[in-house]
Amino acid sequence: MDSEYYSGDQSDDGGATPVQDERDSGSDGEDDVNEQHSGSDTGSVDRHSENETSDREDGLTKIHNGTDSENDEPSNVHASDSESEELHRPKDSDSESEEHAESPASDSENEAVHQQGSDSEKEELLNGHASDSEKEEGRKHAASDSETEDTLQPQGSESDSEDPPRPQASDSESEEPPKPRISDSESEELPKPRISDSESEDPPRPQVSDSESEELPKPRVSDSESEDPPRPQASDSESEELPKPRVSDSESEDPQKGPASDSEAEDASRHKEKPESEDSDGENKREDSEVQNESDGHADRKGLHSSDSEEEEPKRQKIDSDDDGEKEGDEKVAKRKAAVLSDSEDEDKASAAKKSRVISDADDSDSDVVSDKSGKREKTVASDSEEEVGKEESSVKKSEEKDLFGSDSESGNEEENLIADIFGESGDEEEEEFTGFNQEDLEEEKNETQLKEAEDSDSDDNIKRGKHMDFLSDFEMMLQRKKSMCGKRRRNRDGGTFISDADDVVSAMIVKMNEAAEEDRQLNNQKKPALKKLTLLPTVVMHLKKQDLKETFIDSGVMSAIKEWLSPLPDRSLPALKIREELLKILQELPSVSQETLKHSGIGRAVMYLYKHPKESRSNKDMAGKLINEWSRPIFGLTSNYKGMTREEREQRDLEQMPQRRRMSSTGGQTPRRDLEKVLTGEEKALRPGDPGFCARARVPMPSNKDYVVRPKWNVEMESSRPGILKKGLSRLEKHKRRFAEQKRLSQMHRAVKFSIEGNRMPL
């Protein structure tokens, strides 16, 4: 059987063309009985030839046919040969199919009823009714052998395992609209998809997707169900008289594929089925080959089904109900064994029980498939709704963030407003410009200011939370009590008194400072000398220089008091120079001040006023500029630690801060510039006397507009470094020796210098 099957006659190359010849011969020259066989053969061949287009499917078909033919009983050998030849030798299929028409009388397995058992099995997956016809034959024809009834169950099982590949192959080939047997996917699309037996194919079960059609053990089960006595129409796979779309294995999905009626009705419907079989997808083709193999060799259905399931597992993995199909296949393999062992008479009785089992299995699997798919659909719908809700929430959050922090465009305005609040707005009367840092740094660091502002707000929130903290441990309560009872005594630097509570001293000092500033303003209005601040200045400086009180002063509001002292008097005159110098020094020594403190105290405006005032001393202006730079850098997130910057960063910063000079425009009157390279290469000729733009006089060189920021490399590093090395290398001993030699040379007695009148031997 192997040799016959894998012989050159069965090659894929010649299988496609003879299909049409076989169809013609089967339709024209054969009797009705023969037409049934030839038609089934041709249908199988046609689908098989189409199936040969796909190598993988064809390979599977060959494997199944070979195994089936090998496993055929001696009586089935003839049937398997004819079937295999029909598949792979379509030209000879007509004669062989005729022999089949005659052969049924000879062998019980090849009986006319069962001739369709093999042929119809070929067409089972073509028409999806082969299993139906065989099963009904088992009921109607008691003389049917174990083969025919083996096929009933095995086809159900193999169709289960083979269904997954069908729908996948059917998608591409199911594009032929005119034929109702378009494909699994198209039949699923049709509203009438599973009009077959009421039991097997409930209308609500229309296959929703390829995976369903693959999973559907229903069609297979429907074969057995459709064989119920009330529906004897499905005697043979070819009996397509009845438009009842007998939803058999693959064609349970094809609405118009009527259940296979007996061979009598096949004559008219056979011709229709032939084109339909051509139109049927690679699924049906693969099914044809597999079903033929099933009819021939049912003993090895186990191996076939296991191999089929193994090969088709990759496809089943795509399907949700893969496991169900495999389980059912295993159960049905066991059933096939029992069927093979039983006699033909026993099989007639056992077929009914097997059918009932298959039906129950199919119903269970169908219900599982439907439940799984419904659950998946619900999940997908739920996920979609959740995603929409998540999007809405994200949009709401974004809008809230914009309300809280403002958009990016607003961040720049916020920084400008903050600078204006702290240092005041720049006026036209400015005489000097502040060049602390360049605009690029400010723009790059705008985002960090928002973070710092958020941190400040968080700190405020934390303070509020601390006030409202209800729960305190015993240890914390004890610490608070101890702190309140005994404040630390701090000794003043002048060695004087002890201060029991720093807050009282700081608050009293601030009150005195504010009073002195108010008195000076009143005295200035009265045209009297304002000396209150000067008299209080030493005490203020003494307390403000104490390291342990600086934080307390800042928290208590000393910045507003200093602002009052640095502000100009009502007559627009500046306070005393000594006051300005001392307070600016103290401000530099104070620790970092928060932006809120700078904003509310107004110290920034006072310092900026001094920085811009034309009569302010240069030293005070420098200190004021440093203060402004130091206070404003945190607003823009710039670091004030230049030591941490690399050389490249410093050079880049200097380059960016270079003042942009106005480019001199080369306009009329001046000689138009020429590209020297073009002049040298001859592309552009030099101007000659008489040419426009030629100047017959010497010209002053054009000033260079370039900014030289890259220092040229020093090419005499070794020479310049030697003196340093020598100086560093001189030790005390060397210095002493040199000094001693110099003294000795100077202390030596010099002889009388001989000189000549001509000037010879004179020391130069």
UniProtKB/Swiss-Prot annotation:
Motif Integrase domain-binding motif (IBM) positions after renumbering to this chain: 415-441
Modified residues (Phosphothreonine): 380, 435, 671
Record-linked InterPro entries: RNAPII_TF_IWS1, TFIIS/LEDGF_dom_sf, TFIIS_N
Region feature Interaction with SUPT6H and ALYREF, mapped onto this chain: 469-764
Swiss-Prot/TrEMBL GO biological process terms: chromatin remodeling; mRNA processing; poly(A)+ mRNA export from nucleus; regulation of mRNA export from nucleus; regulation of mRNA processing; RNA splicing; transcription elongation-coupled chromatin remodeling
Primary localization: nucleus
Region (Disordered): 1-465, 642-676
Modification after translation (UniProt): Phosphorylation increases its interaction with PSIP1.
GO cellular component: nucleus
TFIIS N-terminal domain ranges (all copies): 560-638
Residue ranges with Acidic residues bias: 426-446
Coiled-coil portions: none
Subcellular location: Nucleus
PTM annotation (N-acetylmethionine): residues: 1
Keyword set, alphabetical order: Acetylation, mRNA processing, mRNA splicing, mRNA transport, Nucleus, Phosphoprotein, Transcription, Transcription regulation, Transport
Residue numbers bearing the Phosphoserine modification: 27, 54, 69, 157, 170, 172, 183, 196, 198, 209, 211, 222, 224, 235, 237, 248, 250, 252, 261, 263, 277, 280, 295, 306-307, 309, 321, 342, 344, 360, 365, 367, 371, 383, 385, 407, 409, 411, 426, 457, 459
Comp. bias regions, Basic and acidic residues: 44-67, 85-102, 119-144, 176-197, 267-320, 370-381, 391-405, 645-656
Family statement: Belongs to the IWS1 family.
Subunit note: Interacts with SUPT6H; binds preferentially to the POLR2A-bound SUPT6H. Interacts with ALYREF/THOC4, SETD2 and PRMT5. Interacts with HDGFRP2. Interacts (via IBM motif) with PSIP1 (via IBD domain); phosphorylation increases its affinity for PSIP1.
Function: Transcription factor which plays a key role in defining the composition of the RNA polymerase II (RNAPII) elongation complex and in modulating the production of mature mRNA transcripts. Acts as an assembly factor to recruit various factors to the RNAPII elongation complex and is recruited to the complex via binding to the transcription elongation factor SUPT6H bound to the C-terminal domain (CTD) of the RNAPII subunit RPB1 (POLR2A).
This protein's name: Protein IWS1 homolog
Species of the source: Rattus norvegicus (Rat)
